C-alpha cells in the first residue's frame, strides 16, 4: 500500500511538472529558484521539528527532576494544617479517638502504678522475711501477709495490658477506615480530573499517592502515632513518680538521658549525609549498568568494553567505601546509646546503694526506681525515631491531600439542562473560531475554523507539536476551549454531557492499549452487554478473527497490555474490532499503522476501510501517503490551521503541505 501511494505521489508531482511545462509560463531560472525555496523550507521544517523534540525532552527531564525532588522530601510543608485536615477527614471516628486518648491516659496511670506498687510489694515481703529471720521461723506467703498485695499488683498489670489492647484495636480501626475513605476518594477524584493533570504527572507518581503514601500514613497512625502518645504518657508518668521517689537519682537519670539523645541526634544527622552520598553512588552504578546493557552494541562497536567495566568498577569501589562508613555509623548508634544507659545505671546504682545504706531509701523503692529507668528510657530513645516516622507520614498525607485538592473538570450540565443530539447522529463537526491554550497566558489556538461534513475523511497533519492531538482532545472535550465553539450536528458540545458526547466517537490510538482480561472482554470493553456472536462479527470485520482462533483458548485467552504473545499490529486490529463493536458515528484514527509490517498494514487498511465506510473520520498521520484520498486535509502549525484543502489543491499551492509531502519522497 505504501509503495503504491508513494508512486501515486510521485506521479502527481510529475503530472504537475508536465502541466507547468505545457503552459510554458515558467522559465528554467524560476523553476530553479522555486526548487531552492522549497528545499530551504523543507530544511527549516526539519530543524523546527528537531527543536520541538529537544524542547519537549528538556521540559520532561526538568519535570521529572522536580517530581523526584518532591518525592524525596519527607518533611511536611505545614505540619499543623495537615494534622487538622486529617482530623477533619476522620470526623466520623472522633469518638474512637476520644476512647483511644482516654485509654492512653489510663494505660499510663496503670503502667506507672505497677512499678510504684511493686515497691510496696517488695517492702512488705522484705519486712515479713526480716521478721521471720529475727524470730527464727519459716516464712510462708499467705493471703493475709502478701497474697492480697501480689494479687493487686497482678491486677494493675492486667488493667494496663487491657487498656493497651483496647487503644491498639481502636487505632487500627480508625487508620484502616481513614485509609479506605481516602482511597475511595482518590479513585473518584481521578475520574474527575482533566486530561491536563495526567499529561503533567507520571503514572507512577499518581499510583504512589493511592498506594504507598496511603499505606505509609495508615501504618504510621497505627504504630507511630500510638507509640508517640503512649511514650509521652509513659515518660511523663514515670519521671513524675521518679521525682517523688528520689530527686537526686532522677536528675542523674535525666542527665544521662539528655546525653544519649544528643549523641543520637549528632550521629543521625551525620548518617543522613553519608546515606545521601551512598544513594548518589547507587544511582551512578545503576546508570552505568543500564548504559552498558542498553548500549551494548555501540560499546562493542567502539571497543569500549574495558572503559565501561572500569567505570562500574570505580563506582562500585566508592559505593563500598561510603556504604561501610554509613553502616558503621548506623550500627554505632545502638551500642553508644546502650553504653550510656549502662553507665547511667551504674551511677544510679552507686548513689542508690549509698542512700539505701543511709536509710534514705527502702529496698522496694530502689528496685522500683530501676523499673522506672527502663519504663522511661526506652520510650525516650524511640521518640526521635517515632517523630521522624510521623513526619514522613504527614508528608505522605500532604501529598495525598494535594492530589485531592487538584482542580477538577468543569461539571457537566444537569440531566435536564444538557443539550441533546436531535435523533440519529449524522456526524457533521464544525470548529467555529476556536481559541485554546494549555496556560491562560500562552494561547495555542487563536482562531481555528473548519467543517467536516457527514461521511468525510478529515486528515490532520503537521510537524511535532503542531497541535494535531490538541485538536482531537478538544473535539472529545478532554480539554475545555477558551473561546468560540465546537458543534456536533449543530449542537454545542460544551453544553452536552461528556458521556453522551464521547459515546459518538470511536478512537484507534497509535499505542493500542489492552486491559487485563480475555480477548473477548477487550473487544467488548466499551460495550459490555455485547453477545459472543457480536464480538466475533466485529473481530471478523477487523480482520483479526483468524488470529484469535489460533490462541490457546481463542476468545477466552487472557491478555494484558504487556503481553509479548500479541504484536503491535494485532493489538491495533483488536482495538479496531473494539471500535466496530461500539458502532460510533465518528472515528478518530491516530497514526494507527505507524509501526507494523506491510502484511499487517494491509490487514489494518482493509479493516480501516470497513470501519470508515459511511462515517466521519479524523485521521492524524505523519506519513502523508496514507491520506492522499482524504476529503479535507488540515495542515497545522503552532496550534493553528495554516492550510486546508484536498491533496491536489495543497500540492498545487506549493505551501507547507507540499514541503512536508515532498520531503517524505525526496
Regions found by a protein language model. Give the residues of each.
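Transmembrane helix-loop-helix hairpins at lipid-water interfaces of multipass membrane proteins
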Residues: 97-163, 243-248, 346, 359-363
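An intracellular "coupling" helix at the cytosolic face of ABC transporter transmembrane type-1 domains
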Residues: 88-92, 195-196, 212-221, 225, ...
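Hydrophobic alpha-helical transmembrane bundles that constitute the permease/transmembrane domains
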Residues: 105-113, 157-165, 217-220, 224-236, ...
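Transmembrane helices of ABC transporter permease
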Residues: 92, 96-109, 223-277, 348-361, ...
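Helix-loop-helix
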Residues: 241-255, 325-398, 403-404
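ABC-type nucleotide-binding domain
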Residues: 2-22, 139, 413-666
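Extended non-transmembrane interhelical loops and adjacent amphipathic helices
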Residues: 3-5, 9-13, 22-84, 172-215, ...
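Juxtamembrane helix-loop junctions of ABC transporter transmembrane domains
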Residues: 72, 76, 102-103, 110-126, ...
Amino acid at each position: 500500500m505504501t509503495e503504491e501511494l508513494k508512486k501515486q505521489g510521485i506521479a502527481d508531482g510529475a503530472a504537475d511538472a508536465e502541466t507547468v511545462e505545457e503552459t510554458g509560463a515558467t522559465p528554467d531560472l524560476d523553476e530553479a529558484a522555486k526548487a531552492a525555496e522549497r528545499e530551504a523550507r523543507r530544511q527549516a521544517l526539519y530543524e523546527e521539528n528537531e527543536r520541538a523534540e529537544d524542547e519537549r525532552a528538556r521540559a520532561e527531564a526538568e519535570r521529572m527532576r522536580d517530581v523526584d525532588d518532591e518525592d524525596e522530601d519527607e518533611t511536611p510543608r505545614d505540619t499543623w494544617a495537615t494534622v487538622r485536615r486529617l482530623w477533619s477527614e476522620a470526623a466520623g471516628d472522633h469518638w474512637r479517638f476520644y476512647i483511644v486518648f482516654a485509654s492512653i491516659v489510663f494505660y499510663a496511670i496503670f503502667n506507672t502504678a505497677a512499678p510504684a506498687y511493686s515497691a510496696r510489694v517488695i517492702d512488705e515481703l522484705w519486712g515479713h522475711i526480716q521478721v521471720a529471720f529475727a524470730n527464727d521461723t519459716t516464712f510462708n506467703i499467705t493471703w493475709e501477709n502478701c497474697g492480697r498485695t501480689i494479687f493487686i499488683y497482678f491486677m494493675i498489670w492486667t488493667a494496663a495490658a487491657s487498656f493497651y489492647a483496647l487503644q491498639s484495636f481502636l487505632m487500627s480501626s480508625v487508620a484502616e477506615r481513614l485509609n479506605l475513605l481516602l482511597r475511595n476518594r482518590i479513585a473518584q477524584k481521578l475520574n474527575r480530573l482533566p486530561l491536563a493533570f495526567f499529561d503533567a504527572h507520571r503514572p507512577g507518581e499518581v499510583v504512589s499517592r493511592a498506594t504507598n503514601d496511603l499505606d505509609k500514613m495508615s501504618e504510621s497512625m497505627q504504630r507511630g502515632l500510638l507509640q508517640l502518645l503512649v511514650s509521652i504518657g509513659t515518660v511523663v508518668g514515670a519521671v513524675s513518680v521518679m521525682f517523688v521517689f528520689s530527686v537526686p537519682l532522677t536528675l542523674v537519670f535525666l542527665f544521662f538521658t539528655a546525653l544519649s539523645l544528643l549523641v543520637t541526634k549528632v550521629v543521625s544527622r551525620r548518617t543522613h549525609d553519608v546515606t545521601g552520598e551512598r544513594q548518589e553512588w547507587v544511582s551512578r552504578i545503576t546508570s552505568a549498568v543500564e548504559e552498558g546493557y542498553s548500549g551494548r552494541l555501540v560499546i562493542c562497536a567502539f571497543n569500549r568494553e574495558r572503559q565501561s567495566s572500569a567505570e562500574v568498577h570505580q563506582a562500585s569501589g566508592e559505593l563500598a567505601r561510603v556504604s561501610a562508613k554509613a553502616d558503621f555509623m548506623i550500627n554505632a548508634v545502638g551500642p553508644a546509646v546502650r553504653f550510656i544507659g549502662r553507665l547511667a545505671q551504674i551511677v544510679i546504682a552507686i548513689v542508690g546503694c549509698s542512700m539505701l545504706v543511709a536509710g534514705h531509701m527502702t529496698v522496694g523503692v530502689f528496685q522500683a526506681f530501676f523499673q522506672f529507668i527502663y519504663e522511661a528510657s526506652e520510650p525516650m530513645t524511640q521518640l526521635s525515631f517515632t517523630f521522624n516516622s510521623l513526619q514522613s507520614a504527614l508528608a505522605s498525607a500532604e501529598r495525598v491531600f494535594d492530589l485531592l485538592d487538584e482542580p477538577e473538570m468543569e461539571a457537566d450540565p444537569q440531566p435536564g439542562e444538557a443539550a441533546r443530539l436531535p435523533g440519529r447522529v449524522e456526524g457533521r463537526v464544525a470548529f467555529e473560531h476556536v481559541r485554546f491554550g494549555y496556560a491562560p497566558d500562552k494561547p495555542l489556538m487563536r482562531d481555528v475554523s473548519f467543517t467536516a461534513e457527514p461521511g468525510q475523511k478529515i486528515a490532520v497533519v503537521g510537524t511535532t507539536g503542531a497541535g494535531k492531538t490538541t485538536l482531537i482532545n478538544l473535539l472529545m472535550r478532554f480539554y475545555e476551549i477558551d473561546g468560540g465553539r465546537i458543534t456536533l450536528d449543530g449542537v454545542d458540545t460544551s453544553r452536552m454531557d461528556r458521556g453522551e458526547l464521547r459515546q459518538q466517537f470511536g478512537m484507534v490510538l497509535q499505542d493500542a492499549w489492552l486491559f487485563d482480561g480475555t480477548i473477548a472482554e477487550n473487544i467488548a470493553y466499551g460495550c459490555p452487554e455485547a453477545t459472543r456472536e457480536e464480538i466475533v462479527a466485529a473481530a471478523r470485520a477487523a480482520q483479526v478473527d483468524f488470529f484469535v482462533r489460533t490462541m490457546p483458548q481463542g476468545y477466552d485467552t487472557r491478555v494484558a497490555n504487556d503481553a509479548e504473545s500479541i504484536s503491535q499490529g494485532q493489538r491495533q486490529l483488536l482495538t479496531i474490532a473494539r471500535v466496530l463493536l461500539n458502532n460510533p458515528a465518528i472515528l478518530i484514527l491516530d497514526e494507527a499503522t505507524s509501526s507494523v509490517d506491510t502484511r499487517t498494514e494491509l490487514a489494518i487498511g482493509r479493516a480501516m476501510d470497513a470501519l470508515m465506510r459511511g462515517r466521519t473520520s479524523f485521521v492524524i498521520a505523519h506519513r502523508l501517503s496514507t491520506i492522499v484520498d482524504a476529503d479535507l486535509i488540515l495542515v497545522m502549525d503552532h496550534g493553528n490551521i495554516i492550510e486546508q484543502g484536498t491533496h491536489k489543491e495543497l500540492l498545487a499551492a506549493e505551501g507547507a503541505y507540499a514541503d512536508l509531502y515532498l520531503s517524505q519522497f525526496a
